[in-house]
Structure formats: C-alpha cells, structure tokens
Amino acid sequence: MSTEPKRKFGVVVVGVGRAGSVRIRDLKDPHSSAFLNLIGYVSRRELGSLDNVRQISLEDALRSQEVDVAYICTESSSHEDYIRQFLQAGKHVLVEYPMALSFAAAQELWELAAQKGRVLHEEHIELLMEEFEFLKREVAGKELLKGSLRFTASPLEEEKFGFPAFSGISRLTWLVSLFGELSLISATMENRKEDQYMKMTVQLETQNKSPLSWIEEKGPGLKRNRHISIHFKSGSLEEVPNVGVNKNIFLKDQDIFIQKLLGQVSAEDLAAEKKRILHCLELASDIQRLCHRKQ
C-alpha cells in the first residue's frame, strides 16, 4: 500500500463477539492504524469501554461525521439491515460473510453501494487460508472428473445464521473459486430437530459437466472438519495435508479492504469478486428453495 491518506478512515465495529473482537484487535495493528482510526464499537448490550475502546450508540455511529466505515460483525440474520442503514448514511461497509440471507437482498445492497459511491466488502477469509492455497495449486491445469466437499460441525442456530447453504457459503465459495461457475442439479435436506441433526446434500455441475457434491452435516458430537475428495484424469486428492497455521487472515482481509478504500483495486478485479459473491448467494438461494420445496 502507498502513502498514508491525508485523513484516516474512522471505523466503528458493530458486534463484539469472536469476529468483532478480532477486528478490534486488528484495527490496532500499527500498519492498519496508519489508514484506519478506531472510533468505537456498537453493541446491543451495555458493556462500557472494552480494551480502551468506547461504546457508542447505533444512532451516533450512523450520524457521526467522524465515522467513515462500519465493520458488521453480528449474527448473519442482522447483516442486511445494518449494511442498508450504514450505506444509506454514506458509510463504507465491511461485513462478515454472508452479507445477506437472500440473493435478492444482496443485489439490492450492491446497487445501494453503487448509488452511494461506497465500498461494500464481504469478508472471505477462507480464500486466504493455507489449505485453499494448497488446493489451488493442486487443481491448477488438471482436468476434473468429479469431486466432493463434506463439512461436519456441531449444531448452529438457523434463526441467527441462516439456512445451511448460507451459513456454509465459505465451502461453496471454495468450490466456485476452484472450479468456476456451477449449475445446481439437486438439493435435499434431512432434518431431525429432536436430535439437533441436519444434513444438506447438494449436487452441482461445472461448466464442463463434471459433477461436484457438497454436504453440510451438523449435529451433537460432530467435530468441525472438512472432508475433500477430488478426482482428476491424472490422479486424485483425498485429503488436504497439514499445511501450516493460518496466520493473520482477518488482518489480510482488512488489508484488501484498505486497498479498496484507497482505490487501489482494479475495476476488473472488483467486478470479478462481485460476480463470484453474487453467484454463490444465488446458488445458496436456489438450494434453499429446492430443499424447502421437497420438505
């Protein structure tokens, strides 16, 4: 990144759970603080000062001339509303994925950001992980025959985090980033609420008609894990080796956001990123529709 801006961008962090706390920590990073000035945080709870960061009301954050940027780090169900409010107030927005729980809402938010001339950045730290870098290298130049990605974890509240195709959109983003735009073939949902168990099974297809399956399985006792199986004409990949610790991935995401604020990301790159994000959200909406139709 080039020289410091004449005035730092004032930032508020909305939501101080795990992601919000990491964002507050990274905003204090010496490199980032050359460009960003942490003004305060917004929370529904009355918490007072946190790590010498003052709590401010949502109304003050929206109204303040000091605030240029909002980081939205709340549960997914509230992302759309917060993004809309801050864009309407003329603020730039960084939001944890997914930005919204429907494709239509995401389209509206992008249009609003364009109307207001503001940066709308959806975080995708999964694309900054060492595992993804390894997969990108393994996939490059090879002809895909078929593949599958299965994710297991403990139960997640759908009311807060959305339908599994949305709460699991980072896995879908991996598949799209590795294999290009995908077509939806089928989607089914097994749901046993009394056992807190769910399994979503999605069949997708690449533009070259190679099949990909994506499974999200959540229930008590299931460990957080990704199971990958990719078959090429030249061989297969059945697991991702331990490729090292994912260091500072939120900070790397913040650096990308700063580059956008400074106008250092090309229009072509911005358009490609927006296209990928909307493609994934459209697939997620279609998957949800198919699963609900079959229940």
From Swiss-Prot:
Disulfide bonds, paired cysteine numbers: none
Chain positions found as N6-acetyllysine: K247, K252
Residues engaged in binding Zn(2+): H279, C280, C291, H292
Parts of the chain that traverse the membrane: none
Enzyme Commission designation: 1.3.1.24
Cofactor field: Zn(2+)
Subcellular location: Cytoplasm, Cytosol
Single Gene Ontology BP annotation: response to oxidative stress
Annotated GO MF terms: biliberdin reductase (NAD+) activity; biliverdin reductase (NADP+) activity; biliverdin reductase [NAD(P)+] activity; nucleotide binding; zinc ion binding
Propeptide stretch(es), residue numbers: 1-2
Cofactor notes: Binds 1 zinc ion per subunit.
Keyword match DNA-binding: no
Pathway terms, separated by semicolons: Porphyrin-containing compound metabolism; protoheme degradation
Modified positions (Phosphoserine) in chain numbering: S154, S177, S229
Reactions catalysed according to its record: (4Z,15Z)-bilirubin IXalpha + NAD(+) = biliverdin IXalpha + NADH + H(+); (4Z,15Z)-bilirubin IXalpha + NADP(+) = biliverdin IXalpha + NADPH + H(+)
The protein's enzyme class: oxidoreductase
InterPro entries: Biliverdin_Rdtase_A, Biliverdin_Rdtase_cat, Gfo/Idh/MocA-like_OxRdtase_N, Gfo/Idh/MocA_Oxidoreductases, NAD(P)-bd_dom_sf
Keywords, in A-Z order: Acetylation, Cytoplasm, Metal-binding, NAD, NADP, Oxidoreductase, Phosphoprotein, Zinc
Pfam families: Biliv-reduc_cat (PF09166), GFO_IDH_MocA (PF01408)
Domain of life according to the entry: Eukaryota
Family of this protein: Belongs to the Gfo/Idh/MocA family. Biliverdin reductase subfamily.
Stated role: Reduces the gamma-methene bridge of the open tetrapyrrole, biliverdin IXalpha, to bilirubin with the concomitant oxidation of a NADH or NADPH cofactor. Does not reduce bilirubin IXbeta. Uses the reactants NADH or NADPH depending on the pH; NADH is used at the acidic pH range (6-6.9) and NADPH at the alkaline range (8.5-8.7). NADPH, however, is the probable reactant in biological systems.
Name of protein: Biliverdin reductase A
Organism lineage string: Eukaryota, Metazoa, Chordata, Craniata, Vertebrata
Primary gene name: Blvra
